[in-house]
Swiss-Prot record:
Keyword ATP-binding set for record: yes
Gene Ontology CC annotations of this record: cytoplasm
Gene: cmk
Binding site for ATP: G7, P8, S9, G10, T11, G12, K13, S14, T15
Record protein name field: Cytidylate kinase
InterPro entries per UniProt: Cytidylate_kin (IPR003136), Cytidylate_kinase_dom (IPR011994), P-loop_NTPase (IPR027417)
Cross-referenced HAMAP family: Cytidyl_kinase_type1 (MF_00238)
CDD domains per record: CMPK
Length: 216
């Protein structure tokens, strides 16, 4: 069974998808972390001297595909975690995700991960492009103001103002929605959930109610 959760940044996709996978005992894939891994790598020496094509042809990074464990990213043997959460990396990932060769590379890895079996995938084009035949497709949304507040809590204190982060989110939304290759859209057949006034637990329960009838 494949469940996809798409939507813009700050809607709670990652938290909800991870909690959903834990409740269902499914595999969980944070596809945004995959793009951020590539972006982080390209920002570091000596890999910042390579082209993107060279990086994806012979990637120094890797991902763990282990059943019933969240996907983890490694660079040169070092597990990446907090390094992927900076705004600099997020902005770089947004730029790189516009490239068709990058999207094609990531889509192949994501479909490979799906071979593990029951999976929850979260991202921006999971239900529209990578898994159009997913069993359950969710599109999470929220107001830009709420999303900025949520993202602010995840960043180091004083790194960005709420106003600056709000502007970054609006800019990212526009780039994601207007990109030529695999833009951010509501997938056909997806259920749209607005999380602006909902807690993570409330969103999770709503999704579980949608998933339960589809369970084998």
């Amino acid at each position: 069974m494949i469940i996809t959760i798409d939507g813009p940044s700050g809607t709670g996709k990652s938290t909800v998808a991870k909690a959903l996978a834990q409740r269902l005992k499914f595999n969980y894939c944070n596809t945004g972390a995959m793009y951020r891994t590539l972006a982080y790598t390209h920002l570091q020496e000596p890999w910042n001297c390579l082209s993107i094509q060279e990086l994806i042809d012979n990637p120094p990074f890797s991902f763990s595909f282990i059943s019933e464990q969240p996907l983890e990213a490694f660079l040169d043997g070092h597990r990446l975690s907090e390094e992927l959460g900076t705004q600099e990396v997020a902005n770089a990932a947004s730029r790189l995700s516009q490239l068709p060769e990058v999207r094609s590379f990531m889509h192949k890895l994501q479909r490979k991960y799906a071979e593990l079996g029951n999976c929850v995938f979260e991202g921006r084009d999971m239900g529209s492009k990578v898994f159009p035949d997913a069993d359950v497709k969710i599109f999470l949304t929220a107001s830009a103001e709420v999303r900025a507040l949520r993202r602010l809590k995840d960043l180091p204190k004083g790194s960005l103002s709420q106003e600056a982060l709000h502007a970054e989110l609006v800019k990212r939304d526009e780039a994601d929605s207007r990109r030529i290759h695999d833009p951010l859209v509501i997938p056909e057949g997806a259920i749209v959930l607005d999380s602006s006034d909902l807690t993570i637990s409330q969103v999770l329960e709503k999704i579980l109610a949608l998933v339960s009838p589809e369970m084998p």
